[in-house]
Amino acid sequence: MKEIAMRNSKRKPEPTPFAGKKLRSTRLRRKRAQISPVLVQSPLWSKQIGVSAASVDSCSDLLADDNVSCGSSRVEKSSNPKKTLIEEVEVSKPGYNVKETIGDSKFRRITRSYSKLHKEKEGDEIEVSESSCVDSNSGAGLRRLNVKGNKINDNDEISFSRSDVTFAGHVSNSRSLNFESENKESDVVSVISGVEYCSKFGSVTGGADNEEIEISKPSSFVEADSSLGSAKELKPELEIVGCVSDLACSEKFSEEVSDSLDDESSEQRSEIYSQYSDFDYSDYTPSIFFDSGSEFSEKSSSDSPISHSRSLYLQFKEQFCRSTIPNDFGSSCEEEIHSELLRFDDEEVEESYLRLRERERSHAYMRDCAKAYCSRMDNTGLIPRLRSIMVQWIVKQCSDMGLQQETLFLGVGLLDRFLSKGSFKSERTLILVGIASLTLATRIEENQPYNSIRKRNFTIQNLRYSRHEVVAMEWLVQEVLNFKCFTPTIFNFLWFYLKAARANPEVERKAKSLAVTSLSDQTQLCFWPSTVAAALVVLACIEHNKISAYQRVIKVHVRTTDNELPECVKSLDWLLGQ
């Protein structure tokens, strides 16, 4: 029972005594002199007289980078045994942040040591006695202050009592003290530096708008006064002090170093080139077209004889019998386009169609030449028979090689245009014109590898032709056509008329098949390519009973006074019976 009673007695809460003001110590504090190393005063602050003083309980940091502890009679920094006595610092400024004033890294410490350079200040510990920071009003307990973060309200006044502080920091000989003000304009700064203590009182005062800072340092220091009249002069000066030295480039390039680098690079290049120069080319096999530069040109050099292709070209040129129609013959009539007729809905399509019609009328492929050419041709003659053979061969070659339809129609068009300008008496040479027309069209329309002559020999009707002969005939074809080789063909106009007819795939396939078949008929040469293309689409629509479709084709095509479409349709009517 006694044990239970003892346990219950222990559990009873004891009344807590009244916590009065706890005295720091019964020992009397010694009287200290009032010394301040920093004095900040503003003319506006000096006008504010009678402001009550508020005190700071304690401070944990004197600098942003140092750790402060309270518990000894002195503030010590382990890195330097020398001491600097800091007395009392009074701050009287409405809205001024003491944390920014005392702990900000902008206000750097200045000691008597100028002999050592670039010492590290990390890892230093500072001990502050309880008496170093005294609350002059309430005597409240110590509390920690965050030096970096916050700002104090406007009507605060803070005072610090003196304490013995030991610093171990070192300042380099070349260190310059730069002050940056976060307040408004018109700041004035004066700095007084020395090397020993002075017994003057220091005060730090600040205002909201204008600021004047005086830093009083021990009187035995070497004095260096610098004053700036206004903030307009101060701010550029501060920028010059802290920034100009950073903008200057300290690097200097030596000409000797650059010369040596050039020599080394040249030596490396010479070594690389020497390795390639010693390479053995005995196993190198040149391409079969390696000698084509001299064989297929006029001559290798000015002193060398003409090439074999050039000599063949001169022979073909002498054998060519030119017709009476001049080479630059143009259309005799300027046709007026009627704007009230049906047009394409798309403006781009309409513009492309009109430009193609203009090229057709103004190009070297002229209707009068074609009519004269057709009138001279006899079905029993040499030229119509050879032309039929060449057209069939061109169609077969394009099908076997998988060439485009544009190449097929351009090759046949070049052949007909050349024969309309003249012909040869030799059958062998006339067949060679067909080969050259296809190879030239292939160069224009096709991509690699078909845009060059890769065959060494061509065989048609038991006739063998060399590559030199084909190239020489290509030169003659281009010269006879006045180098106007890319002309509108029937296939170019088929797309426009099929679009106007709104043709389905069946009508489109039939129209293209009729176009290929019509190439063997020389009567289509008496009409414009656009007229032939429109007639072929009309025939394809008639076969599939698309009456409204071919009527739209007629309306789109008939834009000039010379409407030969009905005659062309009648002349090609036989194609539907094939």
From Swiss-Prot:
Reported phenotype of the disruption mutant: Plants exhibit a severe defect in homolog synapsis recombination and bivalent formation in prophase 1, resulting in random chromosome distribution and formation of abnormal meiotic products.
Extent of Basic residues compositional bias: 21-31
Keyword set, alphabetical order: Cell cycle, Cell division, Cyclin, Meiosis
Domain of life (superkingdom): Eukaryota
Biological process according to GO: cell division; chiasma assembly; double-strand break repair via homologous recombination
InterPro entries (UniProt xref): Cyclin, Cyclin-like_dom, Cyclin-like_sf, Cyclin_C-dom, Cyclin_N, Cyclins_cyclin-box
Sequence segments annotated as region (Disordered): 1-31
Quaternary data: May interact with CDKA-1 and CDKB1-1.
Function: Meiosis-specific cyclin. Required for normal homolog synapsis and recombination in early to mid-prophase 1. May regulate the timing of sister chromatid separation.
Family: Belongs to the cyclin family.
Protein name: Cyclin-SDS
Organism in which the protein naturally occurs: Arabidopsis thaliana
Designated gene of the protein: SDS
